[in-house]
Amino acid sequence: MASNSALLMKTIFLVLIFVSFAISPATSTAPEECGSESANPCVNKAKALPLKVIAIFVILIASMIGVGAPLFSRNVSFLQPDGNIFTIIKCFASGIILGTGFMHVLPDSFEMLSSICLEENPWHKFPFSGFLAMLSGLITLAIDSMATSLYTSKNAVGIMPHGHGHGHGPANDVTLPIKEDDSSNAQLLRYRVIAMVLELGIIVHSVVIGLSLGATSDTCTIKGLIAALCFHQMFEGMGLGGCILQAEYTNMKKFVMAFFFAVTTPFGIALGIALSTVYQDNSPKALITVGLLNACSAGLLIYMALVDLLAAEFMGPKLQGSIKMQFKCLIAALLGCGGMSIIAKWA
């Protein structure tokens, strides 16, 4: 079921890509610099190339550290998944994901889809970024809800013979063990849906920012951008790694999910380098494609951070039973959001 949900989200993103390329900018009245080489004196492809190659390996290592740290936390006594420290770290990582959606991905989408390089009609007459982010959040909600309910219904059918078909009786003393087990399985499924959908949104965003870095040749800003992206990927990986850990996948699946997260930004950088002769980040088609993808990623990340991560944690029995823990986790979430807000100055 979780794999079907991820497949649906991938299909939606692919449809958006095809739609963006189907929209023709042929009659554009954009300035001449749109889709052409920049006149910025800082642009130097020969000097930028070694920096971008270094960025591939540095960001790869930072991503591996970020996503791998939570996965190895079971081997550290004070970082057990049921402990207070791990809960605080999860809230910090959730704040990072929320900050990524609000401070990085969504503003980029607004900037791209309102660029002067795009036609006045329709791009400047309708807030496509906000609309698609909202739609993406609702679609994520639908997938999250339907995947859980379908699993619950399927599991309920499987235990009907033991319940003798009496779904309206108050025989809690007989069905309680089954219900607890069913609830545990449903929660595990939710963790798995969360991990897969969150990984999808992060991967799309990571490829996009990697592509942008690989295509740029601005030596005045590239060093700061690389440093910011290292912190960005490491902290974002912590959030994803925590979700993968809770999903209780097999070691092989954990490795595969961590691997794909770690390599997506370096892959995007390599792709940007390879396409740097033909890809122009200010061309209409590039702006539309990346802008639409960023809007969808933003809606997904914001929903996942607020609903499936922060709200689920704060409304759970652990935090509801301790005002002190609520305060600590709130501070951690604010620090995560604040950190990503600071990084937004450079990336």
Curated annotation (Swiss-Prot):
Protein family membership: Belongs to the ZIP transporter (TC 2.A.5) family.
Misc note: Inhibited by cadmium and Fe(2+) ions and at 100-fold excess inhibited by cobalt, manganese and zinc ions. The availability of secondary non-iron metal substrates (Zn, Mn, and Co) controls the localization of IRT1 between the outer polar domain of the plasma membrane and early endosome/trans-Golgi network in root epidermal cells.
One GO CC annotation: early endosome
Bilayer topology annotation: Multi-pass membrane protein
UniProt note on tissues of expression: Expressed in the external cell layers of the root including the lateral branching zone. Also detected in flowers before pollination.
Side Extracellular, residues: 23-52, 106-125, 214-224, 276-286
UniProt modification remark: Monoubiquitinated on several Lys residues. Monoubiquitination controls trafficking from the plasma membrane and targeting to the vacuole.
Transmembrane regions: 53-73, 85-105, 126-146, 193-213, 225-245, 255-275, 287-307, 327-347
Effect of E111A: Abolishes zinc transport. Abolishes iron and manganese transport
Induction remarks: In roots by iron starvation.
Null mutant phenotype: Plants exhibit a lethal chlorotic phenotype.
Organism: Arabidopsis thaliana (Mouse-ear cress)
Outcome (variant: D108A): Abolishes iron and manganese transport
Protein name: Fe(2+) transport protein 1
Keywords on record: Cell membrane, Endosome, Golgi apparatus, Ion transport, Iron, Iron transport, Isopeptide bond, Membrane, Signal, Transmembrane, Transmembrane helix, Transport, Ubl conjugation, Vacuole
Signal peptide: 1-22
GO molecular function terms attached to this record: copper ion transmembrane transporter activity; iron ion transmembrane transporter activity; zinc ion transmembrane transporter activity
Cytoplasmic topological domain residue ranges: 74-84, 147-192, 246-254, 308-326
One of the protein's GO biological processes: metal ion transport
Domain of life: Eukaryota
Subcellular location field: Cell membrane; Early endosome; Golgi apparatus, trans-Golgi network; Vacuole
